[in-house]
């Protein structure tokens, strides 16, 4: 093994002297290859310099004894590079062992190579001490040992100091302090004679020579002139190796031959080693060491050990695997393989017994077994006492008096503790099974919170605050109406409008109410429903109220008291529209009419408590209504008859409407101011103005009656409003009245606290009624008749019309429901001789007073027609009263609405809704959720309406929803005002109506007349128009018909009247409103419509009627229905496809309604659809698509309630019914949303004034005229849709 010898001899040419300082300098200037070699000398290495490559490379020349330098250099990888034999060898291929053999030789021994081929073995301890060099002195170089990674140092004769003349090398065992004379095994050590190979030590191989103060570059060539290491620390390669094996198992063989095993801990510059847990290894026993033999730590001096062996080391670990945490930790901590899991076989165990941890308190080992085991194996006896007598005092039960006293005292203390709030809170926390999300999320996903809007798709939907009002309108109009019942009391529509406006403010129940009515609603309003007003206002919350319509009314009544002012405004506008007689609607400015309606709504709030109460329950409604009849009934008939019927509060709402009506044109142009003030001022003013209102009083008295009578009353109010509106003075008066109304409404609101309880009671009754009604439609009709009778009786006190209405309702319960709509439609459409005469007459009769009290009936849009209708209604006042259930039947008054047209700006679609008196709609919105009163959500609610009113076409109601969508944003009352001035009701609530109302008026000039009734609805539903696009887009085709019809019907007081869409249950409300509004007095389809309409009215139609004052307006003129068809009706009818002929659409609606029987509002929409299609008048319409088209005579019913608007309202899926309805209607559902609005728009052939549809992009359809109105065409629907948007 002379590879090292050859390597060492390379520098032979160089004198030892060159190793001196001069030599160092020269060395520094050597080529890098030479320097890398680590060998000293001033001359470059000879050509033979490069050591053999590879661990097993045969040495050049004769083999010399192994030396450490060769071990590191030639054995290592670095051997491949010149001069890198030493340390690089350590980094070479992995070796199983690293053995350091220290051959101790006398320091003075001249350097001599071991005989060739002879491998020097380390001397035993028996070696004479003279042969052992002093520790730390340079050791002779050894030649590499090939094979396993072992390092051995064999004694090498050191040349005398003078001979070597080299700087002591940093050999493996050499130290910088070694005498220069000692020829260190440094890589630089050079032997003078070639025969005397100087093997560089492993330390030298490291390239770190003691003399190299700067520190060797080693193979990196990074000079470190300022750093110097002592001893072996200067040998970088050796340091690397020794450091890498720290912590490894190490065997040290000492000079005496003993072998010690331990864990290598550290080393010193002098190569002293420290082993932890060291013990002497005996070859005899293979067993491990004994504890007493293990020494914690042992230091082996460099002079004491011969060989150091590290077992199981991997010197190439740094070059093999990736340096990832997992890879490194796997090496250090062992292999972490996935454990093989084995299936556990429980055997005979049963999970209920042995495996139940809760029942096993032994922690897996029975204490007795443990004690026994310890005793048997260790003789330890346990003193454990299961009674724990050492820690507790056992209670000795006895019957002594003292013990019993103490026991009683203990029980008392325990009860006190357990009943404390702290304890309960702590226990609740411990036992709370809710997840973190349920506890802290802002999104409430509890379906029960939604009060039975189960069918609605938004059960578990998070509705952003910005959209909650619309959603509430769509599917929570009833509910919202309920909370706002106080405000919308007079009619679902007003209530709904208020609701929607409120819903728009749904974020803060009271805030919304404040916005709507200018007066915050009291929390009671939501009390009826499980969720708070804000909840009602919120979209999702609104939905449940819809489902829980019955409960809603009570909630509304409470809310009405708190929010009467605002609600009256918001509701008032819609309710008056539907409530106002045609004549009023036509006469009064349409816009004013909506305002008037809003004010009546305020009144409604004040009197609505009775109304609401009765609305909640027909019976209940009747008494409260009667109690509050003078004040409430007056307003209720005007704007909230429907509402009162549906929600009980409607009456109040009508009152509010009436104040509005006065404002618009209370009873007359001159009375408008007083009437408005009166209703707003509160019940007293309502009474003052309500001399006519009492006629409507019966309507509030009983939900059914309210429905039947309300339409007539609303019709009257509509007429009055229309008259007022028609006359500039009346309009101004109405406006003023409306303005003043808010304050009065507020006052009423405040005074409504008693109403809250009544409302609640009514809600309960309504719920019962709803359930009964669903189960027994016929009985429901009867109950409605009874309720209507009661209402009529209430009204009887004021007017004989009530009796007629009662008879009318009893005559046709299906008609009654249909009548409701028809009433709305009829009263709206007084111009329609066949239906309007009796119905409108009654409505007018009623409305006349109502208008006085409500002053502003939303029928102002149909002012002109309403005027005519009004006169007509005067003749048939009794009949109209009989159809009190159809406050929406109030004259369609689209023309009246044409005046409000200026406010139409906000929403073009609105105009469609406007035509309908919205009075009915107003009344309806509150009932939307109160719907149970009027009709079970799924049951058809027969609306006792005068036979003339019966022909109300459900389709007309549908259009209303168009506005509903916008109205839903009632919360954004400001938007509503845009739609119409009347919406400016003194209360915030007016805003929604205003927003909805003006657009209705402005959009369809002809429509206005036609939509006069609707205009009021739009007031409350003003958002309807605005929201319609929203809702329509949401569920345009699917929900619009059903939702609109039903929702409106259910929640006419809330938003149906002013703007179905605006209402919380805008979706439903709008449609329902539309239906109600559409319920045209058209006799041709009266019967056919009646049955189908019955359903529509029962569930949707009535709701729509109230929801859509327009419906009332429409009734006022049979042809207005075409007007409605152009925009509103078509949509209403379309249910899902407004292109289909109204009959088809109506049929679809019927089917949808059937589908939605569970969902009253939706159902109503469907039914109304079914009714609408049948009417021949509608069929004659040029546009088959447009439902309105189907109903030429009932066109008024259509009263250009933009179906698209309605649909948008329904678009929000407040009720399951929406979807079914849409589907039922036809595959057109999709088209509905987009094309609805324009289709809804219908050119008013007869009425030119309403032609100014510009606002709604709808052709105004004269409500008064009977002529069919050409539909704008579906393109107009698009326009209408835009309008909604």
Swiss-Prot record:
Signal peptide: none
PROSITE patterns per the UniProt record, alphabetical: SM
Biased composition (Gly residues): 205-214
Biased composition (Basic residues): 29-38, 596-606
Residues carrying Phosphothreonine: 710
Compositionally biased tracts (Low complexity): 128-144, 526-552, 685-694, 814-838, 896-907, 1128-1165
Record has Acetylation as a keyword: no
Cross-link annotation Glycyl lysine isopeptide (Lys-Gly) (interchain with G-Cter in SUMO2), location: 864
Pro residues composition-biased segments: 48-65, 554-567
Residue list for modification Phosphoserine: 218-219, 362, 435, 477, 523, 593, 611, 653, 697, 741, 753, 827-828, 832, 836, 838, 859-860
Functional description taken from the UniProt entry: Involved in EGFR trafficking, acting as negative regulator of endocytic EGFR internalization at the plasma membrane.
Family membership: Belongs to the ataxin-2 family.
Protein's name according to its UniProt entry: Ataxin-2
UniProt organism field: Mus musculus
Upper lineage: Eukaryota, Metazoa, Chordata, Craniata, Vertebrata
